[in-house]
């Protein structure tokens, strides 16, 4: 399964640490976060990868160039940040019409990706995407997912005082090939725009 790793953000909440280091290269136990992602995903049989860059992009490009993953990673520089949806739309053909992962690579995650893929394969038929969630003790501090009794997302609430649950959006998604084709067909005009 192919994966797009979103790594273009400014990392403003981690300043001053990110004043000179992109958030995806901030070390955790001495290892850059992006390296942790690439190692974990590769170990689970996931790849190749597309990594978008913007802020301090030269550092990310240099890291990939010097890494063991250089042949598995396509780097796409965004002169203007496109956001999650914009990056997906602009690079939709990367998935080659198959199910694919979309990951905010500036987050740290210890989840079992094989189990996540199995959950996606066994999702209800009406679901076109599987979203990783996590339980939070402070639901008013993050984006909360509202789900029905079948585990289907029915709403989102962003940092509200009275959140409907404590399931937080983990910013990791598996997109079905059906959804990828739908996005490609509905937004093909946007794909032609010069960003």
Which stretches of residues belong to each language-model region?
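Short Gly/Pro-enriched turn/cap motifs at secondary-structure boundaries
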Residues: 16, 80, 134-136, 162-165
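Catalytic-core segments of class I nucleotidyltransferases/pyrophosphorylases
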Residues: 101, 108, 114-123, 137-139, ...
